[in-house]
Amino acid sequence: MDPSTLFLLLIIAAGIILLAVFFTFVPVMLWISALAAGVKISIFTLIGMRLRRVIPNRVVNPLIKAHKAGLDVAINQLESHYLAGGNVDRVVNALIAAQRANIELTFARCAAIDLAGRDVLEAVQMSVNPKVIETPFIAGVAMDGIEVKAKARITVRANIDRLVGGAGEETIIARVGEGIVSTIGSSDNHKKVLENPDMISQTVLSKGLDSGTAFEILSIDIADVDIGKNIGAILQTDQAEADKNIAQAKAEERRAMAVAQEQEMRARVEEMRAKVVEAEAEVPLAMSEALRSGKIGVMDYLNMKNIDADTDMRDSFGKMTKDQNEEDHK
């Protein structure tokens, strides 16, 4: 092969490689699209984005959209927001929606809301079209002891000025639930709540529950009211059961004390019987001593034995008569 021809082929291959690298590194088509949309961007600006590891279409496409919407947004603002980790496309969409709805919203404010983790586009849309938050059934107990369950629908509008640092929907639901419980608990009778559920919404709405939140409460409507358990009767039943258990425990304690006292008295009876037996055992000794010392004679002793025998005989007769009478009664 001719050396000149080989050199020419090498130059052509090198040119093709350089063009491929150029079109890969430099988004020429994106640059042409921006120029066609009337957005003036230097090709070196796009190259600088590549060097700063910024995806050019993530910045240029929102810039074209903002330019077509008539927004005064610089490419440096969009690039800095992208580098900060924000969603450039969502911020531009929020600015366009705010402009169409005549809501004052600057790029700096919108970017701050986006970096705070809030969906700024949803917030703008919610400012135009309020959102309805439905609470679960919230139970409260009226003064007559009847449980009343209420479900509320809260219509809120986003407050863009308080999106950064303001509380969310959970706080709104918790505060409304607290107001419902307080209103039901202050009612003398559960029938008043059933007859006039607007009393709950009016009382709750007058407390300014949206302070410190990212929302403005427009209305609170009671969607459903239901009757729950008779808490007062349940508490009284539980108290009566507890009183019964206490009384049973005290009665058992008294019974145990009575049994213990009975056992103690039986022990004392046995002790007295032992003393009687001991005393009876000393009688023969005393009799023998009296006979030995001559204090009583033999005839006196025999008379005493006869008297004892007569006494035992009368006792046996009495027992026989008593047993016979009991059998006759049976």
From Swiss-Prot:
The chain crosses the membrane at residues 6-26, 28-48. It is a multi-pass membrane protein. Its main location: membrane. Keywords: Cell membrane, Membrane, Transmembrane, Transmembrane helix. It comes from the Bacteria. InterPro entries: FloA (IPR022853). It is found in: Cell membrane; Membrane raft. One of its GO terms (cellular component) is plasma membrane. Pfam families: FloA. Found in functional membrane microdomains (FMM) that may be equivalent to eukaryotic membrane rafts. FMMs are highly dynamic and increase in number as cells age. Flotillins are thought to be important factors in membrane fluidity. Homooligomerizes. Belongs to the flotillin-like FloA family. This is Flotillin-like protein FloA.
